[in-house]
Amino acid sequence: MIDLQLNGYKGVDFNGDGVSTDAIRRACLAYRADGGHRLLATVITDELSTMAARIGRLAAAHREDPTVRDVMAGIHVEGPFISPEPGYVGAHPARHVRPATVAAAETLVAAGEGLVRSRTLAPGPGARVAGELQVNEGRCSRATTTARPPRGRGGAGSRRVAG
């Protein structure tokens, strides 16, 4: 089993401030013992600097610990470029949701030391440019949105067919 969005496991919160390499290793060992194989450790919306620090701790644990390296296939960054609207923001703190910028996206990716494998963002101001950054890296995931496609044009995931 591969879990593409795991916020923590068996009492270890990957979004906890100061989570240690030892705690991350314990979570990985428990995940394996319960039948899991690989996972993407997920960091959710918060202040940009807080998210970067959390991503950095996960990357450091991956670099320092062979068990973590074996289990954690990478990092999934969920937010902060998501919709702040009720019903869409989910469990994310709406006060930390922000429009996407390439600089902010690059800050989060750099903190991951090459381990950011997936990012979730919603359409909105700056999302096209930040999304192109994802596509150029060869990875992209979708988020729900309140956006509606213009009349006569396809929605998310559609493509124009010649003919």
Where are the regions that the model predicts?
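Metallo-beta-lactamase
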Residues: 2-6
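Flexible glycine-/small-residue-enriched beta->alpha junction loops
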Residues: 78-100
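Generic structural signal for well-ordered alpha-helices
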Residues: 28, 52-59, 105, 130
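Active-site mouth loops of central-metabolism enzymes
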Residues: 8-22, 90-98
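Histidine/acidic residue-rich metal-binding segments in metalloenzymes
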Residues: 61, 97-163
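Short acidic, glycine/serine/threonine-rich loops at helix termini
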Residues: 51-53, 85-91, 130-131, 152-154
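Divalent metal-dependent hydrolysis catalytic cores, especially in the metallo-beta-lactamase
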Residues: 7-13, 25-54, 70-84, 112-126, ...
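A glycine-rich helix N-cap at a beta->alpha junction
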Residues: 60-62, 66-72
